[in-house]
Amino acid sequence: RKDAIKIHNEMFPFGLFTELSGAYQFENMFTILKALATLTRLNYNIRSQDYRAGLANVCQLTGLMGRWQKVHSYPDIICDTGHNVDGIEYIHVQLNAIHKTFDQEIHIVFGMVNDKDIRGVLRALPKYATYYFTKASVKRALPENELLALAEEAGLKGTTYPTVVEAVQA
């Protein structure tokens, strides 16, 4: 993948690669490097080929999906399951880059679960985007009409759709 993360430093002169992309993955990679260094100092024998294979195949090994994952081209459709203010702030930075660099309109299909910092997340989203508010098919999902009301308080504009499929198709 062109957008995957590669890191070189003195501890890993041949570099590390992960198939995950997104600005926040740099921070995650450095956390992994710190953990590996700590475990090595504690005499854990973690083989280089094991952590390299784990990082390179993290999606296949864990089933992780939706971390700044490009699922379609022309138009570009990017999926990200960011669910807290920190994650959304990283997403906002990346969306700003796309918006400014390519002068593209940004359309966001958006749903939330009801046990997160909904107001904080909504405040962290870009105001210039067009939103398609929806309810995911999970028990904890916030109804789309409630989400729209909170989004409008945060200065966001959009329309509600009862399902994710309908929101994407709109």
Regions found by a protein language model. Give the residues of each.
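Nucleotide phosphate-binding/pyrophosphate-handling subdomain across enzymes
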Residues: 12-130
